[in-house]
Amino acid sequence: MAKWNPQKRVLNHEHTRFWRFELRDVDEPNLQKEVFPYDEVSRIDFDHRIIPIQPAEEIFITDTTFRDGQQARPPYTTQQIVDLYQMMSRLGGYNGIIRQTEFFLYSNRDKEAVRMCQDLGLQYPEITGWIRAAREDIPLVKEAGLKETGILTSVSDYHIFLKLNMTRSQALEEYLGIVKAILDAGIVPRCHFEDITRADIYGFCIPFAIELMKLREESGVDIKIRLCDTMGYGVTYPGASLPRGVDKLVRAFIDDADVPGRLLEWHGHNDFHKALINATTAWLYGCSAANSTLLGLGERTGNPPIEGLIIEYIGLMGKTNGIDTTVITDIANYFKNEIEYKIPSNYPFVGADFNVTRAGVHADGLIKSEEIYNIFNTTKILKRPIVPMITDKSGKAGIAYWINSHFGLSGDSTVDKRHPGISKINKWIADEYELGRVTTISTEELEAKVRKYMPELFMSDLERIKFKAAEAAIAVLRKIIDDPAMKTMQPELQEPVMQRFIEEYPSIQFAYVVDMNGKKTTRNITNIVDRAKYENYGVGTDQSDREWFIKPLQTGKLHVTDFYISKMTGALCFTVSEPITDDNDDMVGIFGVDIRVEDLVKEPEYIAEATQIALKAEYDAKYKSDHWL
């Protein structure tokens, strides 16, 4: 019988048994070659049915940075995941506009990242899982203590027939079985309708969704459905037909499968430059959740960018609802500085040049009023003031301002216009225009000149590698230092701790402890292959003249040496050392480790550069010694 629609306040027609959406179990896959000819660009066809917008009652954002986002790049470290998760929470705000995020659950690193994010106790985004449609994966979700997980339920015949080697009925039976098993485990299932924009919508997807809604009614659990535009085929044109029309896809699930819009989620890809507009269109036609990643990073061409959805959300709603847009810039800076990801300079909202204009007529407009050529108050909304264009009229003050703005220098780090490097850059610019130049100086040109004339502002690639290696060593070193056994200064207790350290981190060539007089107190803790090389370097060896001993003794702080060539192994190394303190915080000794550069740096040019530095330092030291300097 007809059902009451509380939103539209009328009775919805219910089809008789002669006109119901039931599974069409075909013998051959329907690959819809008339729309998706593999040797040609796919077609965009129209049925000329225009659907009015019917926005979801509530719209929000979900995230897949730590799942889909990691399929496009080297995996994030555990700490990077924790840091990004915290920033994501700040960005989405107290109302949870960024409502959920999903994690892989397979590796120890994945599990550790989930645990560390859970320990933060943040309400949003809620942490959910992602598993295959396999019963053996369900315990992973339970072990992680998660309330919800996504499951891969591919819906196109490309996947069902060609990838899974199943029929539609077999796939449906398999999917419903895993959903029931997840429900039995007390977990909320989120079915990922993979490759939906190439699927038979009324021959498989809607019948599948109807069965899921039956399970929802029986179990009382809100089973969710993610509409996955896996290949980015979705289009937003009025009158575009299924399966590519985003509006018709969303309404089919709501109107014909009786799926509440709050349980629908759009997951898109950017293969045809439509990831963002497809996601926001799904919002406008009743889908509550739009799935995304930070900076749009995802498999192949990526996903809708969170920062883009954030700005679009505010534009559609007319208010922020607790969103902190300035965090967008914090996230971008983290990607650039910590993850060392190069963001394209013209990337919206976060690229180096997104609010920079170079055309002379535009520059004139900006001088008269910032609003003429700036999209909004980028200083207030994104902490990104307009960066001035540099010409021969900028002068030293303008160049200094550009450098400080572009590189985010503040306080004591700022560059003054009297810096000698500024004068050299200013002269180069003047010479350019003297020779007939009429365009503004590009960001790339200025960066190159700043690197040339003000190198102290930059770490070299080699220094950055050393810094990262030392940073990793320091984190482990401090764990060792804090071990109660180390504080005792009793070698028989310290040595087992140090040996475990060496075995866990093979780049550590040698670990040792010296007392306050610089005398070595521990036996040779090294890899077995190097043990014989340290035969004459036993307990009692005097190290009091070594930099790694003197500096921590003087400052009470951790110290990292320059590169050197080990006299024991001939390997290129650097040393990290730190004071050992007792329970009264009194210094009782120094703990040091020698780290092999070759194990950390694979690029031969960097090893060669570091070797030259080490050899020069060795020569200089010998020269001073020979000349009593």
Curated annotation (Swiss-Prot):
One of its GO terms (molecular function) is citrate (Re)-synthase activity. Its EC number is 2.3.3.3. The lineage of its organism: Bacteria, Pseudomonadati, Thermodesulfobacteriota, Syntrophia, Syntrophales. Signal peptide: none annotated. Residues 59-329 form the Pyruvate carboxyltransferase domain. Induction: Expressed under all growth conditions. Inhibited by p-hydroxymercuribenzoate and EDTA. Residues 497-601 form the Cache domain. Belongs to the alpha-IPM synthase/homocitrate synthase family. It comes from Syntrophus aciditrophicus (strain SB). It catalyses: oxaloacetate + acetyl-CoA + H2O = citrate + CoA + H(+). Homotetramer. InterPro entries: Aldolase_TIM (IPR013785), PYR_CT (IPR000891), Sensor-like_sf (IPR029151). It is an enzyme of class 2 (transferase). Pfam families: HMGL-like (PF00682), MCP-like_PDC_1 (PF22673). Disulfide bonds: none annotated. This is Citrate (Re)-synthase. Catalyzes the condensation of the acetyl group of acetyl-CoA with oxaloacetate to form citrate. Its cofactor is Co(2+); Mn(2+). Keywords: Cobalt, Manganese, Transferase.
